[in-house]
Curated annotation (Swiss-Prot), chains A, B:
It is found in: Cytoplasm. Belongs to the class-II aminoacyl-tRNA synthetase family. Its EC number is 6.1.1.21. Its main location: cytoplasm. This is Histidine--tRNA ligase. InterPro entries: aa-tRNA-synth_II, aa-tRNA-synth_II/BPL/LPL, Anticodon-bd, Anticodon-bd_dom_sf, His-tRNA-ligase, HisRS-like_core, HisRS/HisZ. SUPFAM superfamilies: Class II aaRS ABD-related, Class II aaRS and biotin synthetases.
Length: 467, 467
């Protein structure tokens, strides 16, 4: 056996990293639940036919195939396998809605009646890894978690409103101070392209260029678009709208009059106006969102409102979403025809951003208090009671371990462990301390040590940790 | 595209099931952390050489291989692939300890010093899916979660003590009233076999038969052992010890005198005696554990204390563990030579047991209060404020969604949704109610409806839910 290792593009998450990941995931879950989203998990291994033809030619090349040991021997070169690893969480959602969306079960309130197995609308969140056989690189992994919240089965603009509200609440809860949810609408962009006299066939490529406006200066994007065959009049028409400035209401007002000739644009503007009204009525602080007509979002399946969150950290967007009213039909193979709208939090980027912004400063590792242990039976009892009392008070207390029988090296080992794991305090009760009814309390940050009364040691330590 | 479906032996966890799973996992995590265990996650895809030769011939056949799309074309029949899916959580733990166990990093307390990247002992928990290409059947899945807590790097009997203490605490916290942690020791069993005059080469097969004593009557097990070549004297010597009855202390006392001639047995008995003393000193209720000399545990890698938890539910053991002081060396390819002891909770069986025992009765789904919405701007504002206030009070409140513009069907849809999702209350504020400064509160369990003052509606509802 050579050196131990993992596959490129995959990661071991050791405790210090896991504690950060779990903190972010738990914060998001709490907010998802508060807004009425319910958890869903699907298998890592999907049938190939569920994934086939869903991710475009380039995407499909990145799918990992799964082969049982028995089938390895019979697999023919170039043959597709029956099973493959999950590539995203949207296709599994469409499959779940297609399979169970119309299933009826006994009504819990009245067993004689039937009710839908999945509520409609179905509001679910899903936080699971996905796999892509991409070339690994800075911030690009072959195994990474996606973290999605979607509503399937409603066209109400309240859906977009609540997804944006929960996005704002989530980033505030994670400690972000400076972030913006940029909002736009696919119908507005469609109308803009239409009214600028650009052929509808060019819509996707024009949007791809517009989407670069957050990284490139407008002149460069104009040049790129000219290279795609747009003339000066068309470019002027586009940029006149994109360059609109002011409050969200002012930008929409400007677009309303400039795009008066496009029915699609007017529909988009109408929906965004309603969204702004609802966001205000729901009390979402307008400092955290704004209409941005340069937001295009690469993926071509969006049909309505689109949004994307950017922060002060240099990591790119930390979350994005939008309405996609035709995708569930396509992805479920026509088994479910339901409108949908969702948002996705970029877990790895959020972690990188929080690291950059110093938002993990107060996160502690698992250990809080280490009670050293010497193996003397009378003393053991006292140490055990102290640990038990601390744990009952909600403190993460540990007993020091030593080899049997106890040797002086055992104490050095235990203090080394306390240091490696970042404990706040160590408590030492030896035979001497016990005879005096005392314990030695060592603050492992300042390295100062003091004597405290044994009888009230647990209370005193719990109090200091929680102050 | 044919019918939608999943691979046999895998499962979609819809919200009602997920809520139960998350409840159990969150309960276990809280207890792991309290005892100083830290989270670890490793990639689903491992290098083949990490897994090869670790699970025996039969186990290895169940491993799923992973192939990128590009490699499908060049894969030769029968050829092993470079990568495969995780089969358990113990081999990845050994790999992690082998890779990072001796790595040094800057000491957080003093950057000029170096400290170990992983604390020693390393106390980690890991809750992740594993994959096995087994034939699916009742309670046998191809993708299922394992839930392990292990301590690597200490021979202290405090490790076993705390693992059993946390096991008892976990099952109590999950609501189990009637359960037992059965405890035995591999050295005691080894000494028993030795002293009965049975060849050491027969140890594994004899233990396999003894392990069946919880399902088969002693006569059947005797018959099976006789079939394996044991004579009457050997069988009597075995069963004289196994049949010892009484308190844990009495059983150990009996074994101590019957197995006086075996050094291994006396070592095992000495360690179990210390364990009982420590469990009592730590205040673990002795109603929940006992020495059971018929417990053998199938896996042959255990070297010391072994234990297994059984409950009143008919699902088999719900958890098990033990000390395995040589396994990390073997599994890490000799990169780490550390003693270890761990426990594993059987998540699927725990869920089945809790279902059987009715321990999920009080678990609620995501929805608590649905505030119906009619789309009238003035009323909207009131509904939004009500939802916002309820959420701030920690209530899982949702706004009803309806298609725009609102039609009378919208109200029926919203009440249908409330029913499907099991909400406790629906709140209705229409123009009439608003004019009277009232809201209609419908209890969705009793289906009774009453008028409440709008101004204090949020407080009143939050109070009822929390009472």
């Amino acid at each position: 056996m050579g050196e131990l290792g993992t596959m490129g593009g995959t990661r071991d998450f050791l405790p210090d990293e896991m504690i950060r990941r779990e903190y972010v995931i738990d914060t998001l879950k709490t907010i998802f639940r508060k807004y009425g989203f319910e958890p869903l998990e699907t298998p890592a291994i999907e049938r190939w036919e569920t994934l086939a033809g869903k991710y475009g030619e380039e995407g499909e090349k990145l799918i990992y195939h799964v082969v049982s040991s028995g089938s390895l021997g019979t697999l023919k070169a170039g043959e597709r396998t029956e099973h493959a690893l999950r590539y995203d969480l949207t296709v599994p959602l469409a499959r779940v809605v297609g399979m169970y969306g119309d299933q009826m079960v006994a009504d819990p309130a009245d067993p004689k009646k039937q009710t839908r197995r999945l509520p409609r609308p179905f509001k679910r969140y899903q936080i699971q890894p996905v796999w892509r056989g991409d070339r690994p690189g800075e911030g690009r992994y072959r195994e990474f978690h996606q973290c999605d919240a979607d509503v399937v089965g409603s066209t109400s603009p309240l859906v977009e409103t609540e997804l944006i509200a929960l996005t704002v609440e989530a980033f505030k809860a994670l400690g972000f101070a400076d972030f913006t949810v940029k909002i736009n609408h696919r119908q507005l962009l469609k109308g803009l392209i239409e009214q600028a006299g650009i052929a509808p066939t060019k819509e996707a490529t024009v949007l791809t260029s517009i989407d670069k406006l957050d990284k490139l200066p407008p002149e460069k994007v104009r040049l790129e678009l000219a290279g795609k065959g747009l003339n000066a009049d068309q470019l002027d028409a586009l940029f006149q709208v994109i360059a609109l400035e002011g409050t969200s209401e002012q930008v929409l007002e400007g677009a309303r009059s400039l795009l008066a000739g496009s029915e699609a644009a007017q529909r988009g503007i109408g929906e965004l106006t309603k969204l702004l009204h609802y966001l205000e009525a729901l009390g979402v602080d307008s400092a955290y969102y704004r209409i941005d007509l340069a937001l295009a979002r690469g993926l071509d399946y969006y049909t309505g409102t689109i949004f994307e969150t950017v922060s002060a950290a240099k990591v790119g967007s930390v979350g994005a979403g939008g309405r996609y009213d035709r995708l569930i039909y396509d992805l479920s193979g026509g088994k479910a025809d339901l409108p949908a709208c969702g948002t996705s939090f970029g877990l790895d980027r959020i972690l990188a951003a929080m690291d950059q912004l110093g938002l993990f400063a107060s996160l502690r590792r698992a250990g809080e208090v280490l009670v050293l242990h010497f193996g003397d039976p009378g003393v053991s009892q006292v140490c055990f009671e102290l640990v038990r009392g601390l744990r009952e008070a909600g403190v993460r207390a540990e007993l020091g371990y030593h080899e049997e029988p106890f040797t002086p090296n055992g104490m050095r080992q235990q203090l080394g462990y306390a240091n490696e794991k970042g404990f706040a305090y160590a408590v030492i009760v030896g035979p001497d301390e016990m005879a005096q009814g005392q314990a030695a309390l060592r603050d492992l940050t300042t390295r100062r040590q003091e004597k405290i009364p044994l009888a009230t040691a647990g209370q005193l330590i719990a109090g200091r940790l929680r102050s």
